[in-house]
Amino acid sequence: MSKKYAAFITALFCVFIFGFGAALLISPDRDFSQQENRYLAKFEAPTLSTLKSGEFMKDFEQYVIDQFPLRDGWIQLKAWCERLVGKQENNGVYLGTDDGQTLFAQYTKPSAEDLAKRVGYVNQLGANVEVPVYFALIPDKSYVWADRLPHRAPLVDDGSTIQESMDLTGEDVTYIDLRDAFSGDDVFYRTDHHWSLFGAFQGYEALNQAMGVETVTPEGEPTRVSDSFYGTTYSSSGAGWVRPDEIYTWVSPQGITVTAYPAGQPEPGVLYDKSYLEKKDKYSMFLGGNKPLAVLENPQATGGKLLVIRDSYSDALAPFLAQSWQEVHLFDVRYNLNSVQQYVEENHIDQVLVLFSASNFSTESNLFVMSR
């Protein structure tokens, strides 16, 4: 290697390092990444305590990673490079065999002890209340669309979490097996972990059949409201080549009253908040996003009062449930730590449904609320 060439490489390296360092200092910090759909780390001034504990360096490292100039472009470049060398995974996301158009988040199965504790909370709920309690886990996309997974992908849902949950369910709770409820190419979003409108409808049919409630097929045809949805799995994958998903609605909001409780007090809610269609988080169009509690009322329905202990999958399911139940109470344990037993009694609930995705049930830290 000639001295001139070595000097050129050294100079180029210095320009790269100092240039990006200067850009990091000059550029204003970003609060939120639309690409990754998450808040980014901010700079925290060091203190004697954080310097001694090493916490400052840990936080500063995350700050540099999050605020690195042109971060979104580098993430996509890395994904392209990984794909070109034949890798089937990037940033914890598997690339589907359909030319990488379906993205699968890695699924980590809980330990036997942890799963027993989690199902135990459901069993305690069944023992605490005097009304029927149903329990169902929604299989992960990697279970339903296993034929699209890359060969020998290790961290996927093989159905064993659901089977073991069924085996652990006590006599006071009726388990509803949804593993065979889904069919078709559109029951999940390719770029997100949630089920689509069509998957939610198939889940609704299976749940109602098990609970002995009439299934109502909405009038007309589903309406496409967005053709540019990129979900959370896409956000972490960097897979810039993937086509966007489409979002549909089907149930008319007419005749359905929604009351939301974002901070403990009732406020008028909506079945569909279409302002979210102009944002990255388009899935939050259903019910307007996460709420500790929401109540849907439909006096024309034939069912009674249903309480759903739920995660975000029920946002897309709720419009269908509102066709069958006069009242649907959506209780989100992520944000609502009140006594479920007391809620059932005070609101004269007729049936309780505990419904989570298998992945969320395996990781949610507030399931203990059900035992109160």
Regions found by a protein language model. Give the residues of each.
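Extracellular glycan-modifying ectodomains
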Residues: M1-R372
